[in-house]
Amino acid sequence: MSSSQESTFTSASAAAQVNASALDLLPVYAKELIAGGAAGAFAKTAVAPLERVKILLQTRTEGFQSLGILQSLRKLWQYEGIRGFYKGNGASVLRIVPYAALHYMTYEQYRCWILNNSASSIGTGPVVDLLAGSAAGGTAVLCTYPLDLARTKLAYQVSNVGQTGNALGNSGQQQTYNGIKDVFKTVYKEGGARSLYRGVGPTLIGILPYAGLKFYIYEDLKSQVPDDYKDSVILKLSCGALAGLFGQTLTYPLDVVRRQMQVQSKQSQNSSDGFRIRGTFQGLLLIIRCQGWRQLFAGLSLNYVKVVPSVAIGFTTYDMMKALLGVPPRERVHASGGNK
């Protein structure tokens, strides 16, 4: 029996060594992709109910226009049950995994490139994080935007479960979608591949400063922390949360324009009521004129509630996954150059 236990232990040890050696063979950028994807999935799922309510408020969905956060959550529970909290989350996670993976990985890559090629002219301070974060945000958005469009259209639908009649929040003209694939097929039929990127303008205009500011503020705040507390998870989370809150406040109106552009159907664009968003700045002015300036900040308080845990979970998971996968410290990566 002893020999059997020893054999089992030896086999387990050998398997662990094989797994460890396999991880060692992965390039650093692949490990950063894995860590970033895991961070995005955990963070997005944790705040999915709040994200659903935020979209309903941003798009002025009928029945939710005058409700607060708790009232909206209760209404979703009443008509759709717990599944209503996560409607569109499949598309959201499907988008956020490649988005977060690309965002974190390209941020590290852009940062390394800037330091290796432009450090003499722009220095090595937080401005590097501003530039790298902005470039990474734009790259990730362009690669994953159709999935964000699908997520928004699915979350915009509110079903009146168990009752007849139109779905809550959707007029008779609104298209009903049965999943991510159905969204892609329907939107593509409406206007081709270009329709899959409806609203990408305000998204890019918003993400470039937001992503840059988030990394800039996060790294700048971390640099102010005394050396004895540099490894404190709580302080890292606090820095990340503050960075996220500040960046969100500055760029939130652009997010509202993006959401309203995304839920516009071909029918609504051809309507005679005059409300049709054609571009970012025209959309800002149109919303102010027709819906009031407060609509540009609809759901912002909810976003504050959402951003704090989302950023906290995202940064924490990313750091934990990097440690688990054996990603070397940033300074070592830059020094070696070739690892990247």
Swiss-Prot record:
Keywords: Membrane, Mitochondrion, Mitochondrion inner membrane, Repeat, Transmembrane, Transmembrane helix, Transport. SUPFAM superfamilies: Mitochondrial carrier. This is Mitochondrial carrier protein CoAc1. Solcar repeats lie at residues 27-113, 124-224, 231-324. PANTHER family: SOLUTE CARRIER FAMILY 25. Expressed throughout the plant. It comes from the Eukaryota. Its main location: mitochondrion. The gene is COAC1. It is a multi-pass membrane protein. One of its GO terms (molecular function) is coenzyme A transmembrane transporter activity.
